[in-house]
Structures are given as structure tokens and as C-alpha cells.
Regions:
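Pre-recognition alpha-helix immediately N-terminal to the DNA-recognition helix
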Residues: 9-14, 25
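Amphipathic alpha-helical dimerization/coiled-coil segments
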Residues: 77-118
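Short acidic, hydrophobic short linear motifs in intrinsically disordered regions
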Residues: 21-29
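Short, cationic-aromatic polyanion-contact patches
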Residues: 3-7, 59-77
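Short helix-to-turn junction characteristic of helix-turn-helix DNA-binding domains
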Residues: 15-19
Length: 121
């Protein structure tokens, strides 16, 4: 699947939360929080169908949309893309960056240590 834009992520979050969902329901929800024009939202939906992120099913006079990929799959792909683009694929460089920028709290560090301990090979 191709990477999805920030705007497409907003559509995906609605679809993941309420799948299956009609196009008008997606428009109603996103228009309320983003102020986007309904045509813009329909364009984003079409792009996501083209990218294979959501599927459309004809239901009488309207289309019903549902996620073709899970949120976890998209997060994994976005994470890998981000790591590759910003840190040459190095998770160590990412964590080092957060430590150097003083972005990790003591609680964050403890949680990371627990995650590392539980996943030690």
C-alpha cells in the first residue's frame, strides 16, 4: 500500500472506528471537526480506495466503506517510512534523538526499559 497523507489518516481513523460506514457519515463526521468541503472528503475517500486502504461496497443507492488494512498495519508502515526517512532506519538513532532533546520523562524511560526486558531475545 502507498503511504497515506495526513488528511487521509483522518479519513482512515473514522473508517477504522465505524466500519462499515457510508460516505455521507464520513463527510458528516469530518466536516464537523475539520471544516473541510464535502467534495474534498469524497476525493480523499476515492484516493484511499485507489490506494487499497479502504474498500467500497455498493448498498442500494449509496456506498459503504470499510478498512482494507488494519490500523496496526498502517502504523507499522508509517513508522518504518518515518524511521527510514529521518534516521536511516535506525531505531537507536530515534531513541538517542529523544534522549538528547530531553523529550523522555523518567516514566518513559522506565516503560521503555520494561518493554526491552520483556522482548529480550
Amino acid at each position: 500500500m502507498n503511504n497515506i497523507s495526513d488528511s487521509e489518516w483522518k479519513v482512515m481513523k473514522v473508517v477504522w472506528k465505524k466500519s462499515p460506514i457510508s460516505g455521507s457519515e464520513i463527510v458528516d463526521e469530518l466536516e464537523a471537526v475539520t471544516g473541510w468541503n464535502p467534495k474534498t472528503i469524497h476525493t480523499l475517500i476515492r484516493r484511499l480506495v485507489t490506494k487499497g486502504a479502504i474498500n467500497a461496497k455498493k448498498e442500494n443507492t449509496y456506498y459503504s466503506y470499510y478498512a482494507a488494512v488494519s490500523e496496526a498495519e498502517c502504523v507499522k508502515e508509517e513508522t518504518e517510512t518515518f524511521l527510514e526517512k529521518c534516521f536511516n532506519g535506525s531505531l537507536n538513532m530515534l531513541v538517542s534523538n529523544f534522549i538528547k532533546e530531553d523529550k523522555l520523562t523518567d516514566q518513559d524511560i522506565e516503560e521503555l526499559q520494561e518493554i526491552l526486558k520483556s522482548n529480550k531475545r
